[in-house]
Amino acid sequence: MRVLGIETSCDETGIAIFDDQKGILSHQLYSQVKLHADYGGVVPELASRDHVRKTIPLIQAALREAGLGKDDIDGIAYTAGPGLVGAILVGATIGRSLAMAWNKPAIAVHHMEGHLLAPMLEERAPEFPFVALLVSGGHSMLVRVDGIGSYQLLGESIDDAAGEAFDKTAKLMGLDYPGGPLLSRLAEKGTTGRFTFPRPMTDRPGLDMSFSGLKTFAANTIAANGDDEQTRADIARAFEDAVVDTLAIKCRRALKETGLNRLVVAGGVSANRHLRAQLAELMESLKGEVFYPRTEYCTDNGAMIAYAGMQRLKAGVFEPLAVKAVPRWPLDTLDPI
């Protein structure tokens, strides 16, 4: 069986085809970074319009890359939420239209379930159950995963997501958009220990997180110490250390509370090398395992949507004729399959 996956929840247009025997047959991705750079962030209306321009050509390119036609596709999966409603509607409408025109099942996929399952595309894939740390520009959450669709939310950010905090702090430091990866590169030049940032919400029980205060702390530190190149690098180092330490502390707690020893880390921030190194040390100390998607599947992409769609199609889960777009959609409301 083969599923075409469509991802348009924010500022990447991602298209992929997944074969349940051969894996990913094609993977097309277009990023809108240049489009939004002048504005310092994603402009929803511009994002939607660009998805309108790019989605169908990328679907055609994915079919050509795989050497397939419409008759070779068994289902069409699309991101139905959460995300920017206009952007979601573009992919959802195109996906549903193709499904009706080609007489194929349409599968609405939860964007964060796509991220959560992305490590399943790797040769070394995790087995259920496990704890998942989902960290991106829009979400930071810890989830107990007992199976596909069987999710228990353990904790989440009560304000900014980790990726959002990276981008906002980078903007404060005068870095270009998107600033998160640039801040991490700058942090590599920094001196550990010159500045010490708080580890928010680690001094109390629970698995919820908070990152907005780190942005304010960074602004105050810059104001008090100047912004020469080395100072900026040292502040970036302190900021990244605080975020990574906080995530690692929360992961340790989640694993202890659940009694599990497998950790999945996914979402855009999961590509952060410092985070990967620290979580690898954590899991080694716990005699457990940690799993990530490859870097190209950390950010938004169609491959994760095609894979998640395939699992639901195999379970007989597909959509009625109405187009489904859900801007706010808690992950733990999905039904197990």
Swiss-Prot record:
Binds 1 Fe(2+) ion per subunit. Fe cation binds at H111, H115, D300. GO terms for biological process: tRNA threonylcarbamoyladenosine modification. PROSITE patterns: GLYCOPROTEASE. The lineage of its organism: Bacteria, Pseudomonadati, Pseudomonadota, Gammaproteobacteria, Aeromonadales. Pfam families: TsaD (PF00814). Substrate binds at L134, V135, S136, G137, G138, D167, G180, N272. Keywords: Acyltransferase, Cytoplasm, Iron, Metal-binding, Transferase, tRNA processing. Belongs to the KAE1 / TsaD family. Its cofactor is Fe(2+). One of its GO terms (molecular function) is iron ion binding. It is found in: Cytoplasm. The gene is tsaD. One of its GO terms (cellular component) is cytoplasm. Its EC number is 2.3.1.234. This is tRNA N6-adenosine threonylcarbamoyltransferase. Required for the formation of a threonylcarbamoyl group on adenosine at position 37 (t(6)A37) in tRNAs that read codons beginning with adenine. Is involved in the transfer of the threonylcarbamoyl moiety of threonylcarbamoyl-AMP (TC-AMP) to the N6 group of A37, together with TsaE and TsaB. TsaD likely plays a direct catalytic role in this reaction.
